[in-house]
Amino acid sequence: GLPCGESCVYIPCISTVLGCSCSNKVCYRD
């Protein structure tokens, strides 16, 4: 539920290594 300050509209979340995932074109963590 916390935004990771990254979008995933065109490319995947680089912050997935930090536990972030793509949701509604924005990377979130929990």
UniProtKB/Swiss-Prot annotation:
This is a cyclic peptide. There is a cross-link at residues 1-30 (Cyclopeptide (Gly-Asp)). Detected in stems (at protein level). Disulfide bonds join 4-20, 8-22, 13-27. InterPro entries: Cyclotide, Cyclotide_bracelet_CS, Cyclotide_sf. Keywords: Disulfide bond, Knottin, Plant defense. One of its GO terms (biological process) is defense response. The keyword Chloroplast does not apply. Pfam families: Cyclotide (PF03784). Coiled coil: none annotated. Probably participates in a plant defense mechanism. The presence of a 'disulfide through disulfide knot' structurally defines this protein as a knottin. This is Cyclotide hyen-G. It comes from Pigea enneasperma. The lineage of its organism: Eukaryota, Viridiplantae, Streptophyta, Embryophyta, Tracheophyta.
